C-alpha cells in the first residue's frame, strides 16, 4: 500500500499556492475573488506547516497553523465588512473604484 508522504503534501500546497497567485494576477477587477485567492494561498501555507510538523515530529507547526487560521478568519471578516460598507455607499466593489477612497 502506498503511503502519502511529504512530497505529496508539498505538491498539493504548491498547486494551491500557484492557483491563488494566478487568481490575484489574472483577476484584478473583483475584490471578492482577490480575497478568496489570498485565503487559498494561506491554506497552502498551512498545509506546508502541518506537513513539515508531521515530518519533523514537532507540534509547533500545527500550533502556528492554528494561529494563521485564526488571523485569516479575522482578516476575512474585516475585509468583507469593509466591502459591505463600501458597496452600500458606492453601489459597486470594483477595484478601480476602491482606489478612489480617501482616509
Swiss-Prot record:
It is a multi-pass membrane protein. Its main location: membrane. One of its GO terms (molecular function) is quinone binding. Disulfide bonds: none annotated. InterPro entries: NADH_UbQ_OxRdtase_chain4L/K, NUOK/Mnh_C1-like. It comes from Rhodopseudomonas palustris (strain ATCC BAA-98 / CGA009). Belongs to the complex I subunit 4L family. Keywords: Cell inner membrane, Cell membrane, Membrane, NAD, Quinone, Translocase, Transmembrane, Transmembrane helix, Transport, Ubiquinone. One of its GO terms (cellular component) is plasma membrane. Its EC number is 7.1.1.-. It is found in: Cell inner membrane. This is NADH-quinone oxidoreductase subunit K 1. PANTHER family: NADH DEHYDROGENASE SUBUNIT 4L-RELATED, NADH-UBIQUINONE OXIDOREDUCTASE SUBUNIT ND4L. The chain crosses the membrane at residues 6-26, 32-52, 67-87. NDH-1 shuttles electrons from NADH, via FMN and iron-sulfur (Fe-S) centers, to quinones in the respiratory chain. The immediate electron acceptor for the enzyme in this species is believed to be ubiquinone. Couples the redox reaction to proton translocation (for every two electrons transferred, four hydrogen ions are translocated across the cytoplasmic membrane), and thus conserves the redox energy in a proton gradient. GO terms for biological process: ATP synthesis coupled electron transport. It catalyses: a quinone + NADH + 5 H(+)(in) = a quinol + NAD(+) + 4 H(+)(out). NDH-1 is composed of 14 different subunits. Subunits NuoA, H, J, K, L, M, N constitute the membrane sector of the complex. It is an enzyme of class 7 (translocase). HAMAP family: NDH1_NuoK.
